Every structure is written in structure tokens, then in C-alpha cells.
Amino acid sequence: MNSPAIIPQQDNNLFERIAQTCMETPRVAILMSGTGSNARNILEQRHRYPNFQFVAIATDRPSTHCYALAREFGLAHILVMQWGKIPFDRKAFFDEVAQHFRHMGINFLIYAGFLKVAPKDFLTEFPGINIHPADLTIRDKTGMPKYRGIAALSYALNAGEQYVASSIHVVEEAVDGGLIIAISKHLPIPVHQTYDLRELHEDLKRTCEHPLYPQVLALLSRGQIARDILPLRAEYRNLDELI
């Protein structure tokens, strides 16, 4: 595995706000664009962060399982789309999402496979965390995460990485560039012809992301994550030591 490089400076104020909010009684919305496996996993383990008030699940796609999940867990369902608008009007989209969140008193966001990139003013008003299918401590020559964006797993495979991992980070406007909170254990990449990218992603979610996300939320809810101990690493067991 590659050695981590020095992490560029991020907005520490966002993390401090998140840490403080999570120790109180945050009103939470989950954002998703896909199947919702991480969203379901987080909701099924909500007893681990009992002070969290889950209010809504938001999506940008009608084909997701968002409505079914919201109905199952008694949450509001928010669907915001922009039919036929080319190019995508990011400001208008997030202004509409923000209106919903303000009305519901949302003050903490959990991103679970949400594919839209929010603008800075939205992120400042509604701070949140995201899980990303790559080890974001691996850096490129510019000091930015080497495997960022929607094709991160594909980039890692093409680069010949022998292991993959997932990272939880503060959401900032730079894609996958926010403060790294935790890194999952590393998953070896099987080498055989029938193993495809989708299968790898599902294995990564099941083996790495599903244990990690609720664990980090539980630690945040109890005030056990401080800026000076980040990033936490499941590989080194310092996550387990806090439980």
C-alpha cells in the first residue's frame, strides 16, 4: 500500500461544528442517489446514536429506493430533480434542497452515495459527512487525494493497487477533499477474470463501509472524536479502542 502524504489544510470549523452538533440532538437528513444500502445500514443501527433525530431522506433520482426507505423508517421523503435542464443548474437544485431542510430544521447531513456536488454556501449552512470508496490519504503529486470522484475504484484498479478501502470525510466543495475522519480496513483485490468492478464495490460496501459508518456516527454522538486524533484507522484498531 502507498504511504499517506501530508494532508492539505481543510476547513476545521466545519468539523468542529459537526462534532458539537452530533453530541447534542442533531436533526438529520440522509442524502442518496443509489440503492440505499448504506442509508439502510445507518438507519438499522440508529440505536447506537440514540440522540440523533432522523428526519428525512433526500434523493435526486426517482429510481432509487429512497421512498421505500423513508416509508419503512417513518421519515420524510424528499425528491428534487431538474427535468430537461442542460446544463445542470447546481445553485437552483441546492437552493430547493435547502428550502426543504430549513423547513424541517435539519442541521446535520449524512451523505450515503449522493452524486451531486454541493456549493460552499449549502455546505456551510448544512455541514455533513460522506463515505467514499477509496483511501483518501493516498495522494497524487499535487497533494490532493489520488482516488477521488465517482470513478475512484476504477482509478485504483487501473493503477494496480492491491488493496482498496473506504474513507469517511467532512463534505467540502472540493470533491472528496474534506477533512478525513476515518479509514476502513483494507480489502484485498481478488485477481481473477470473473471479478468485476461492481462486485468489488459491493464487497467494499459490505466488508468496509457498513461496519465503519455506524461506528463513526456512534463515536461522534458520544463526543469521542477529536481533531487531533484524525484520521482514525480501523486497520490500526484505534477505532475499536474508542468503542
Residue spans for each PLM region:
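One-carbon transfer enzymes
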Residues: 1-243
